[in-house]
């Protein structure tokens, strides 16, 4: 869990990590003080952290505002070694509840706290990845990744794009999703009225002498109508991904 609170003069970021060997019962998602429980499958879930020596505690309830969107299977490798082989789905919705850390309690109103939830399974390059066999060769080049689950008043958008170092698309998924006022109104695991998109495009504007992005234009084209959808972004603050665990020096 990572909490990033942005105010007018400061930004507080704190993370809670927990891990253990998976047990025999797949529905038991308890790791020490952490618990993830499914309230209604593919609609709502609850995260609970009981009091522990990290100073973290809290309870958050997620409720879907959209149905789920399945992302394409992601596979990457170096030589004969698989670095990533995952399946994932994403759902956009509301979060409500509270978190407490550093002796400060923060309340989250579900009516104004919009966010996302994704679940993935498989091999991921965390904690060094798969250590079996000979050491992996140094990685040549890199990977370009854009992921944007977006909330608007009357719809949500999902934009995901992986490219290689030459700008060639590896994986992509684009969709415009209807929104619903309650989880009871969700039409099912997936929504048959979702507008699927292709031809994902991006235009990034970088700060001078920096790799920091200042503004972005994302675009995609509706498959059935051919209509091009363009969304513009301006930078508000910087989010540090390593706090979650990606390429973290210790976690």
Predicted regions span which residues?
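Intrinsically disordered, low-complexity linker/loop segments enriched in Gly/Pro
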Residues: 29-145, 152
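Acidic/His-leaning functional-site neighborhoods
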Residues: 46-79, 168-251
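Short, exposed beta-strand/loop patches in secreted or surface proteins that constitute
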Residues: 18-22, 27-40, 204-209
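Single conserved hydrophobic/aromatic residue that forms the stacking wall/gate
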Residues: 1-7, 11-12
